[in-house]
């Protein structure tokens, strides 16, 4: 991360800056780049902020919807998920800082492969899946298997399952259904 490229909103009041010193805010980006490990480019289809109270260690999460129109740099307003594709984490963090009056310096970026590896390292995740969701997961599982070289099985019907990484990532990608 090139800190010289990170912008902050200079109009933040001294009072707000004082309050912000008691907190750490971490930007979290989930990329839909299908390049299996290349975290330097791609649209950030997931943008979340983790705000940590340094005294109490309380964590609050906020999601910034990917279709939110923000100034992504140089006065250009477009869907905020374009900032990461346009200028990497520096541009995406700058966009959040300038538009939301923040001073973010830390971030985490994941892609499909990162999610798959994390879930597999944890031994899977227990989920109750509906018949509709099992059907919708099929195409995503096929695509993720091709991208990653995995051989995860499709779910033929609903039920309670311990999903492996590919299956969990496929489930997370469902955008519609009953």
Q: What is the predicted role of each segment?
A:
Residues 1-178:
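Non-catalytic, solvent-exposed segments at the cell envelope interface
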């Amino acid at each position: 991360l090139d800190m010289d490229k990170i912008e902050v909103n200079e109009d933040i009041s001294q009072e707000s800056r004082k309050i912000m010193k008691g907190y750490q805010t971490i930007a979290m980006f989930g990329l839909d780049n299908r390049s299996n490990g290349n975290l330097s480019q791609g649209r950030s289809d997931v943008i979340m902020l983790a705000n940590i109270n340094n005294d109490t260690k309380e964590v609050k999460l906020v999601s910034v919807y990917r279709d939110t129109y923000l100034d992504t740099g140089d006065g250009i307003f477009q869907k905020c998920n374009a900032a990461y594709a346009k200028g990497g984490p520096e541009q995406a963090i700058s966009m959040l800082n300038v538009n939301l009056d923040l001073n973010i310096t830390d971030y985490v970026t994941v892609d499909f492969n990162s999610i798959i590896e994390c879930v597999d390292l944890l031994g899977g995740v227990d989920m109750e899946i509906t018949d509709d969701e099992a059907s919708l997961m099929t195409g995503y599982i096929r695509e993720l298997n091709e991208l990653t070289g995995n051989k995860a099985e499709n779910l033929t019907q609903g039920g309670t399952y311990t999903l492996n990484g590919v299956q969990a990532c496929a489930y997370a990608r469902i955008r519609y259904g009953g």
